[in-house]
Amino acid sequence: MPSGFQQIGSEDGEPPQQRVTGTLVLAVFSAVLGSLQFGYNIGVINAPQKVIEQSYNETWLGRQGPEGPSSIPPGTLTTLWALSVAIFSVGGMISSFLIGIISQWLGRKRAMLVNNVLAVLGGSLMGLANAAASYEMLILGRFLIGAYSGLTSGLVPMYVGEIAPTHLRGALGTLNQLAIVIGILIAQVLGLESLLGTASLWPLLLGLTVLPALLQLVLLPFCPESPRYLYIIQNLEGPARKSLKRLTGWADVSGVLAELKDEKRKLERERPLSLLQLLGSRTHRQPLIIAVVLQLSQQLSGINAVFYYSTSIFETAGVGQPAYATIGAGVVNTVFTLVSVLLVERAGRRTLHLLGLAGMCGCAILMTVALLLLERVPAMSYVSIVAIFGFVAFFEIGPGPIPWFIVAELFSQGPRPAAMAVAGFSNWTSNFIIGMGFQYVAEAMGPYVFLLFAVLLLGFFIFTFLRVPETRGRTFDQISAAFHRTPSLLEQEVKPSTELEYLGPDEND
């Protein structure tokens, strides 16, 4: 029998589809406000780069006193700026280790509520940094908002995945990525010089991140806790029943609870795993490797190099209005995330991920060719725009949304929090490497920098083709049980796997 309230067998063997209730909509919307902040703080640092660097220089001059001040050395300015960008990822790396602990201790909903303290503190520090003439405050604020985003990157997919019906789990899981890209787009638009990207208003631009945090603080108390957490982890049948009634809109949820009881009995043989226990578990080795590689495929694809440095990339490519081209990329980003929302339950996770990786690889090669020929063929600047827009579009078809929620699908309730922590750490570590190192690698490799990403994308495509299963339409229990019945990834003969052969139809289907 399928586990969880997501899929419930009917008398004729066909599972009825749970309707979308107002409570479910409110809960998902409230949760993904955190993802909106995550995206906003990825994109907000890009457009005002020059005015923030000017502020850094003014602070540097002011600290030297009136006698013989000299401008900040270019190397020091580059390091300060790279740190301002990349410290966001350091915060995410550190906090991602706490996802499992906090989500088990406080619960999914309360953990998201408490997490907003970091968002308010980080946003306040960034907003007041210029008035205090302190680039250290801005860097600390970026660190705190990164720590907030690190927790969000695990808590939101976990919560949404546990409250979503099976037939909508992919689409609702993709809303996490949609909120991220909308946040990026909002930051890019507000960062224009005609709006908040000015020498006097950039602190307001960075500080606005406190607004969605405050809205989430208002809305989340009206949302139910995950019934899976309440019943399976906390053994609270009454609150779990109440939560299920609100989420499903059904007066009788006894069938759902029966399935949760069945899953709980199975999980009593599989206690919640600590991080070290998960890393040492042969049973979970295969899904863990898949989860980590999928996270690496997202970050090492080069997408955040485009988000962090898109304006300077367009300038290098000879685009006349790079800020507007960057916003164009943000619009493409949002539109194709919506496409992914519509396709993920039809085409499946694996197919979309493969399509996205292949398309990004082709666009990275096209971008390299355009940059190489730019001096001889000025029209190549338009080709570079098409290449970056295509790069972003294919990212949002697959590598953008798929890795986050597929990790939650690959693990049962016991190891899921620890698995989200490992996946989050992998994602944030690679994010930090790109954020800190891309500027230096781009200077060293010149037009060939995107060729490096093309090679990585090809490697991730091959891994996905050979090893990543299709999870569409499967319950958490089915997917987890399938991995328990197969040998470790390291012990298997390498062969293409369009769908795990042991993920056959449930006998009640």
Swiss-Prot record:
Biological process according to GO: amylopectin biosynthetic process; brown fat cell differentiation; carbohydrate metabolic process; cellular response to hypoxia; cellular response to insulin stimulus; cellular response to osmotic stress; cellular response to tumor necrosis factor; D-glucose import
Phosphoserine modification, residue list: 10, 274, 488
Classification via SUPFAM superfamilies: MFS general substrate transporter
Effect of residue 223 to S: Loss of palmitoylation
Record: glycosylation sites: 57
Lipidation (S-palmitoyl cysteine): 223
Compartment annotation: Cell membrane; Endomembrane system; Cytoplasm, Perinuclear region
Chief site of localization: membrane
Record's catalysed reaction(s): D-glucose(out) = D-glucose(in)
Motif Dileucine internalization motif: where in chain: 489-490
Sequence ranges on the Cytoplasmic membrane side: 1-24, 103-111, 164-171, 223-287, 345-353, 406-417, 467-509
Tissues in which the UniProt entry reports expression: Skeletal and cardiac muscles; brown and white fat.
Extracellular face residues: 46-81, 133-142, 193-201, 309-323, 375-384, 439-445
Residue ranges of the region described as Interaction with SRFBP1: 7-13
Membrane topology: Multi-pass membrane protein
Modified residues annotated as Phosphothreonine in this record: 486
Keyword check for Cytoplasm: yes
Gene Ontology molecular function: any one: D-glucose uniporter activity
Free-text description of this protein's post-translational modifications in UniProt: Sumoylated.
Binding site for D-glucose: 177, 298-299, 304, 333, 396, 404
Disease connection: Type 2 diabetes mellitus: A multifactorial disorder of glucose homeostasis caused by a lack of sensitivity to insulin. Affected individuals usually have an obese body habitus and manifestations of a metabolic syndrome characterized by diabetes, insulin resistance, hypertension and hypertriglyceridemia. The disease results in long-term complications that affect the eyes, kidneys, nerves, and blood vessels.
Entries under NCBIfam families matching the protein: SP
Free-text note regarding domains: The dileucine internalization motif is critical for intracellular sequestration.
Protein family membership: Belongs to the major facilitator superfamily. Sugar transporter (TC 2.A.1.1) family. Glucose transporter subfamily.
Subunit description: Interacts with NDUFA9. Binds to DAXX. Interacts via its N-terminus with SRFBP1. Interacts with TRARG1; the interaction is required for proper SLC2A4 recycling after insulin stimulation.
Name of the protein this chain belongs to: Solute carrier family 2, facilitated glucose transporter member 4
